[in-house]
Amino acid sequence: MGNLVAIVGRPNVGKSTLFNRLTKTRQAIVNEQAGTTRDRQYGKSEWVGHEFSVVDTGGWVVNSDDVFEEEIRKQVSLAIDEADVILFVVDVVNGVTDLDMAVASILRRTKKPVIMVANKTDNNELQYNAAEFYKLGLGDPYCISALSGSGTGELLDLVVGKFSKEGEELLDEDIPRFAVVGRPNAGKSSIINAFIGEDRNIVTEIAGTTRDSIYTRYEKFGFDFYLVDTAGIRKKNKVSEDLEYYSVIRSIRSIENSDVCILMLDATRGIEGQDLNIFSLIQRNQKGLVVVVNKWDLVENKNAKVMKTYEEAIRSRLAPFVDFPIIFASALTKQRIFKVLETAKEVYQARTTRIPTARLNEEMLPLIEAYPPPSNKGKYIKIKYCTQLPNTQVPSFVFFANLPQYVKEPYKRFLENKIREKWNLSGTPINIFIRQK
């Protein structure tokens, strides 16, 4: 189970700069293709063999310069709920403020590890100023400069040292892990209740290393599966989810710990920006996807044409990834609930598909010969062989070419589409690599 590090603090203390430093990104370099610019608030980091996720909880706040104490309190409460380690960023140039005091008063009550990061410490004189932050009662202020990177290596040593040393969950790897995700009021709780019904369907609860219950195993309708973080979805949330970044951050852990994500959409509202944010997280983590259009019972004049219009709109918004199942369901009336689980299991099986090398070459090489990669500066690109890589999270294929550097993304998409035409890989991402033969 991955660890989650949350960055909190009042506006303008350098949270975004620290986030960019830890995730080795710059805000100017953000992939806009996913249909959202909010990806920059969530990233992956790795330090001395430890992989973890980083969230800038303030990053989802619009006009963050105008954030008041109550908004900061919500962010910090969210971090306490969701994170394994909390980085509380303060500004040594401006010193202790009332908002810093307010944040510290909340953090002092948590049992989660809190590291106070004294940012903008660019010289020795400012290091002396950091002593002022002892009054916040959170231990030693850790001096860094997020802008120059000074002190961030030692900070990362401290962060990974705070991660739980307990063993990982003892999960049966052959049993699929499903996560139900979506924006507030899309019907997550309703569909989970429809899946599992009464508590007697619970087989085992496996305690997470840092959570009350991350995985719960169920046997229902002839299926054997884990639901990820259902306790978190079913409990009454301490933090209101009226603002979209709350539910997006809450989705991170569920997505990371799943094999297949069941993305709930509200049929009465269509696909919205928040749905795109969650879809982007699913894509970046390379998880299987089943889209469920819930509350289908509330749609009037339902027919095949209306259904087709919905499908086209969803695939258009989620492009370029369009090969995923869409199910029109009602958690309330239990319409097609069985179909949702059945499809999620099929997507899980697609993720583990193995295609024999001989068969792959037999199908793909004639296509490549008929439609070769475009030549580059008069040089012809030849692909002679392909194979599926072993032991990968999702189906991954390598094509060996004489000039791999000239094979561009559109041709990789062509290869992916042809593989999808030949084999049923609906719902699972696949990777295409071009290597020197």
From Swiss-Prot:
One of its GO terms (molecular function) is ribosome binding. Residues 3-167, 176-352 form the EngA-type G domain. One of its GO terms (biological process) is ribosome biogenesis. It holds the Pfam family KH_dom-like. Keywords: GTP-binding, Nucleotide-binding, Repeat, Ribosome biogenesis. PANTHER family: GTPASE DER. Belongs to the TRAFAC class TrmE-Era-EngA-EngB-Septin-like GTPase superfamily. EngA (Der) GTPase family. This is GTPase Der. It comes from Phocaeicola vulgatus (strain ATCC 8482 / DSM 1447 / JCM 5826 / CCUG 4940 / NBRC 14291 / NCTC 11154) (Bacteroides vulgatus).
